[in-house]
Regions:
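Short beta-strand micro-motifs in enzyme catalytic cores
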Residues: 10, 39, 100-104
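Conserved beta-strand and immediately adjacent loop positions that scaffold enzyme active sites
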Residues: 13, 39, 122
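Generic C-terminal helix-cap and adjacent flexible tail
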Residues: 20-22, 149-154
Length: 154
């Protein structure tokens, strides 16, 4: 008997960033050092007790770009502008499903206010150098790090 193919899950998310509010000037040393001038939005998921980049599953007939923008707004209250597409990450879920997540850089257009819910109870802006101690997934760090390859506005 042929084995059934694992369920495919399509998801998308955003690396929502802003310049640090510390008043530090934006680096002139190139894209890699530019990450040091940025803060990134992380969401806390009480179900898993972890911090991660905002993302979620696509709805039927929804493009990955639409999914990324919708999920970021639902999870953070932030309306964003889609920037460069970053990495695509694939992994198996604990249930053995194949999940593919497409990521985009995003800049905030408007803050509609964060409202805690069952899925996400907090958001936190974190500096690049602090991410490794907070992010639950190494793939989130890889996605953020991928911003450094873009020399133009992301």
């Amino acid at each position: 008997m042929a084995e059934s193919k694992p369920r495919q899950i399509r998801a998308a998310g955003g690396v929502v960033w802003r310049l640090r509010s510390s008043g530090q000037p934006q680096s002139e040393l190139g894209p890699q050092s530019r990450l040091a001038d940025m803060e990134f939005a992380l969401v806390h998921r009480p179900r898993y007790q972890d911090w991660s980049l905002p993302k979620g599953k696509a709805k039927k007939r929804e493009s990955s770009e639409q999914t990324a923008l919708r999920e970021v707004r639902e999870e953070t209250g932030l309306e964003c502008k889609l920037g460069e597409e970053l990495l695509t990450v694939q992994y198996l879920t604990p249930k053995g499903e194949e999940k593919t997540v497409r990521w985009w850089a995003m800049r905030v257009l408007k803050d509609h206010g964060f409202e805690p819910n069952e899925e996400v109870d907090r958001i936190f802006w974190v500096a690049f150098e602090e991410l490794s101690g907070i992010c639950a997934f190494s793939s989130d760090l890889e996605v953020v790090h991928s911003l450094s390859i873009y020399e133009r506005d992301i």
